A protein has these predicted regions:
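Long, low-complexity intrinsically disordered regions
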Residues: 1-272, 277-340
Length: 340
């Protein structure tokens, strides 16, 4: 079994995440290529597409949201993701029974499924949904997260298109997006296949970390995806991968890239050293679920960035090598111009 080095895994991940070179893609194919973007903070998805897509414009994403070609919804790990409409139905079916929602929450959500589907045809706030549940169905609930996640999944409630705009409204509203419910296994086959195409080669623990699925629920999906390629990492752990997925050379050059808050590149593996050294991990991913905006130098997270008075400010973890200083400045200037 071939052993892949850390740098080989790094280059493979960056290639699949469209971070070796920007590609000329429209929004929907780009989202499907990278298995969606984490989207708790809507502007992050715009920066995430800008750093991956050649010529990306904000209007392109806003148009895709308005046309419901792109959907912002609770999916993997119970977090908000921006995905294509096609992937929304399959991803939602795959993770709805992932085990992280208490059975009683799912049962309660199923009881009001038909009613919430009808009620959700018009955009509603969370407060409006819970008031309606009390008034119309006598369900007095404290608004716990488990029930709210279950309600959105069982009722197919997604963030209304305007909640994903660059300038978000103050009150998030939710609306029904129709999709055909798919059996768990074919949905998980699709989900795991998307993950490997976007983040592989990967261990089973990596797939579980990103998807929120238990390893025992991942195994049948891997069986259905056979034949798969198998490798080992430098610690001897088995990696699985799709047969024709790219594996760039270790000496493949990597341009400087700026990643937004919550970017899945730093979140989608159990072992995140393929993109971020352990010594910097707590600086990037810390309390309250915050994931900072970062920049990559030679393919690895080298520091943080923020916008201050209209300027992009970089905070490297260590002094940048001389050869990388100008490329970092140039990419920061490009991002600054785009944000303006």
């Amino acid at each position: 079994m071939r052993t892949l080095t850390l740098r080989e895994l790094n280059r493979a991940t960056l290639a699949r995440q469209l971070l070796l070179e920007r590609r000329r893609l429209s929004v929907v194919p780009a989202l499907e290529r990278v298995a969606g973007l984490q989207a708790q903070w809507a502007p992050a998805t715009y920066v995430g597409l800008w750093t991956r897509v050649d010529g990306f414009r904000r209007e392109a994403l806003e148009r895709a949201l308005t046309r419901e070609q792109a959907v912002r919804a609770v999916l993997m790990r119970g977090t908000v993701h921006l995905v294509s409409r096609r992937d929304y139905g399959l991803f939602g079916s795959a993770v709805a029974q992932a085990g992280w929602i208490r059975p009683e929450s799912l049962e309660l959500a199923e009881q009001v499924h038909d009613a919430i589907v009808e009620y959700g045809r018009e955009p509603r706030t969370k407060a409006e949904v819970f008031a309606w549940l009390l008034d119309e169905h006598g369900i007095d609930h404290d608004g716990g997260l488990g029930f709210w996640y279950a309600l959105r999944m069982a009722g197919r409630l997604t963030h209304a298109p305007e909640s994903g705009m660059w300038k978000q409204p103050r009150d998030t509203r939710f609306v029904l997006i129709e999709h055909e419910l798919v059996d768990a296994l074919p949905a998980r086959v699709h989900l795991v296949g998307r993950y490997l195409a976007a983040f592989g080669p990967a261990t089973r623990a990596d797939i579980s970390e990103w998807s929120g699925l238990r390893v025992r629920d991942i195994e049948p999906a891997l069986d259905a995806l056979e034949p798969l390629r198998r490798f080992a990492d430098e610690r001897g752990r088995e990696l699985v991968d799709l047969p024709r997925a790219p594996l760039p050379s270790v000496d493949t050059p990597v341009p400087v890239r700026f990643l937004p808050r919550f970017d899945n590149v730093v979140l989608s593996h159990a072992d995140r050293t393929r993109v971020i050294a352990d010594e910097y991990r707590s600086t990037v991913i810390h309390g309250g679920g915050m994931v900072e905006a970062t920049f990559l130098v030679d393919g690895f997270v080298a520091g943080l960035w923020r916008v201050e008075k209209g300027r992009v400010r970089v905070e490297p973890f260590a002094p940048l090598p001389r050869a990388w200083r100008r490329p970092v400045e140039d990419e920061a200037s490009r991002l600054e111009a785009w944000l303006a």
